[in-house]
């Protein structure tokens, strides 16, 4: 069983992994023949308590559990090369298993279109260099070309990151998939199971039906909230609403966002990514060593340089935001709105349009036509 790691514990897999195990037992597979390999990707290993959080106490007490370490080459097996040139190294325990079942949830994903499914194999149980090669497909062909527009939210067909992941997954050929679909309240809305690709694809359609919100057109101003605690505990998490805001806002428009960021320094890898002098240097750094915190910072900097971003946050965060992120910190929404109105007047915009999005990371806006 390849099970998502602690960073995806919101998937509520602890509530249904036991049912999968029971079905396997009923089919004649004893506990000794079943094991879990956590899909850590490039994340750290779990504590014992986190193992229990992911799969539940009953499962954790009766099934062997292993941690995937992407940098441990002694536990990786080369299974092939994708058509895009990614050398696919996968956790040997997964490669040598007679059957592989994927357990997670389905969500939207900025880079891969949707999460879940093939992502449990790559990056989930892939080697570090394999993950690096795959994720670099999220960038354009040359330095200076920035983000690859095909590696985008909701996009599967023609998405080089997603298609590369799917190729790697097909090399392992999982036999089954069980995924939850989680609603905005964090509850299981539905479940999908069956063929690892077809069931996952049906789940992506369900997520799209749940999260899509129609808008008539992009607007001059978008007021967006990250969604409050715990979605805005830091900038790394809170800025997930920027993708939604960008879709809803005209290029060069104004974004007013609310991110409290009580732990503004966390994670250090994200805030430290703003050390580069300019966008080109940041892109060069990303191509040299691709990390998700650096990629998120790169996306955020592009947003701040193509829009005016007013961020309502704690006053103690102001200096960090001014110095590093090219965003304009303010203490209240009212203050941000006064600055926005002044900017609109200076631009000669009297008949401006506004979108208001209370839960920025929980919806996907789309233009009516």
Question: Model-flagged regions — what are they?
Answer:
Residues 146-229:
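Membrane-embedded hairpin module used as a gating/binding unit in multi-pass transport
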Residues 2, 101-103, 220-225, 256, ...:
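Structural motif
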Residues 45-115:
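An acidic, phosphate/nucleotide-engaging active-site surface
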């Amino acid at each position: 069983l390849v099970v998502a790691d602690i960073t995806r514990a919101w998937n509520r897999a602890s509530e249904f992994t036991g049912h999968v195990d029971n079905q396997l037992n009923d089919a004649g597979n004893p506990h000794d023949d079943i094991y879990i390999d956590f899909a850590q990707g490039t994340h750290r290993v779990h504590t014992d308590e986190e193992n229990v959080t992911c799969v539940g106490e009953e499962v954790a007490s009766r099934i062997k559990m292993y941690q995937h370490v992407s940098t441990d080459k002694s536990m990786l097996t080369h299974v092939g090369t994708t058509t895009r040139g990614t050398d696919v190294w996968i956790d040997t325990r997964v490669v040598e298993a007679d059957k592989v079942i994927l357990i997670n949830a389905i969500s939207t994903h900025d880079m891969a279109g949707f999460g879940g499914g093939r992502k449990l194999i790559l990056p989930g149980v892939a080697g570090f260099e394999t993950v690096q090669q795959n994720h670099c497909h999220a960038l354009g062909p040359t330095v200076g070309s920035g983000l690859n527009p095909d590696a985008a939210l909701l996009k599967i067909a023609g998405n080089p990151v997603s298609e590369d992941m799917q190729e790697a997954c097909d090399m392992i050929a999982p036999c089954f998939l069980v995924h939850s679909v989680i609603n905005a309240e964090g509850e299981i809305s539905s479940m999908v199971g069956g063929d690892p690709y077809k069931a996952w694809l049906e789940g992506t359609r369900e997520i799209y039906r749940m999260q899509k919100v129609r808008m008539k057109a992009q607007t001059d101003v978008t007021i967006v909230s990250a969604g409050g605690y715990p979605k805005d505990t830091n900038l790394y998490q809170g800025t997930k609403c920027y993708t939604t805001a960008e879709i809803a806002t005209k290029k060069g428009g104004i974004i007013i966002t609310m991110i409290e960021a009580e732990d503004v320094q966390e994670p250090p890898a994200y805030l430290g990514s703003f050390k580069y002098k300019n966008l080109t240097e940041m892109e060069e750094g990303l191509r040299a060593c691709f990390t998700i915190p650096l990629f998120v910072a790169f996306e955020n900097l592009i947003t701040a340089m193509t829009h005016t971003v007013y961020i309502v946050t704690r006053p103690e965060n102001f200096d960090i935001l001014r110095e590093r992120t090219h965003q304009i910190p303010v203490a209240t929404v009212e203050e941000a709105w006064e600055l926005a109105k002044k900017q609109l007047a200076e631009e000669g915009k009297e008949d401006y349009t506004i979108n208001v999005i209370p839960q920025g990371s929980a919806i996907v806006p789309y233009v009516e036509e």
